[in-house]
Amino acid sequence: MKHLMSGNEATARGVYEAGIKVCSAYPGTPSTEILENLPQYGQEVYCEWAPNEKVATEVAYGASVAGSRAFCTMKMVGLNVAADPLFTAGYMGVNGAYVV
């Protein structure tokens, strides 16, 4: 069956179908709808709003180090705030999966 979705709705569906277990995000257009649409798929994905982009990145990265598949979303400018933990992630690697 075909469904008409926005790009953010399709991203949320892809996150669910990829088996992501932890999703952390900082709200801000245009990425807010991704986390807002995930709960419709049930309790299989833990979703959390973070106080800033750095914390959102650290939550998702921590879950991936612990072996979970994790997803972090934020607007592009937020990558400046999240740069420090992203650089660390590049050196340490993950045990699960980590998508930003």
Q: What residue ranges belong to the model's regions?
A:
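N-terminal glycine-rich anion-binding loops that anchor highly charged ligand groups
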Residues: 3-39, 58
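Thiamine diphosphate
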Residues: 30-100
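Residue-level marker of alpha-helix boundaries and capping positions
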Residues: 2, 10, 25, 47-51, ...
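Residue-level detector of functional hotspots within protein domains
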Residues: 1, 6-9, 65, 84
